[in-house]
């Protein structure tokens, strides 16, 4: 068992006084209680598979996502990826999916586990949005901007990293770093990579984005008719209950 606490010495001492009785209650948990608990839980079963799937609804809007891994990319600049995430979210994806496409929102993300995703919500489109995702790597390869624009993107990225944190947020970040084996040195390295990012670093991340799309599977929640029109994209289509 791992217990995380955020607080001062007084809170820590209070936890120490209570943890013993808490563990005793766990030890006293009877089989009958276990069965009663399981009765109200849906038990996951079956083999997990990578499939592109859609869930149909009567709504006229879609939620369009594609997610994949980029294990095959040898060298990854995690700081540059954070800059690219900001750039895609507030430039390419914003303009193509939100402004031109009419979606309420859109975004992408990449993590240290070499996973990435693109997603839109309240989106009137389906295949057009997927096509935008597929051309994101091309956008990065051809990216060109004045130094001032690159600096603005870096500032926007670093502001999300260096934002003031509440005690709750500090505790959450600390626990997440502990569970994922992220050290202070790793976080500082990523911060330095963000600050030192240039146009060439941005262009080189195209390999990561291209691999996410190549490896990716699609998941869509949306209009039944639109999904039926694009049924070849999916290995599974089910009504959303």
Give the positions of each predicted feature.
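Nucleic-acid-interacting cores, centered on viral/eukaryotic replication and modification enzymes
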Residues: 11-13, 150, 196, 210-215, ...
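His/Glu-based metal-binding/catalytic segments typifying zinc-dependent metallopeptidases
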Residues: 4, 9, 16-20, 24-98, ...
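Short amphipathic alpha-helices in soluble, non-transmembrane regions
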Residues: 16-23, 131-136, 233-234
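M16 family metallopeptidases and their MPP-like homologs
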Residues: 1-7, 62-84, 92-199, 205, ...
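Glycine-rich, charged/polar anion/phosphate-binding loops
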Residues: 48-53, 104-105, 203
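C-terminal structured interaction module
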Residues: 30, 223-241
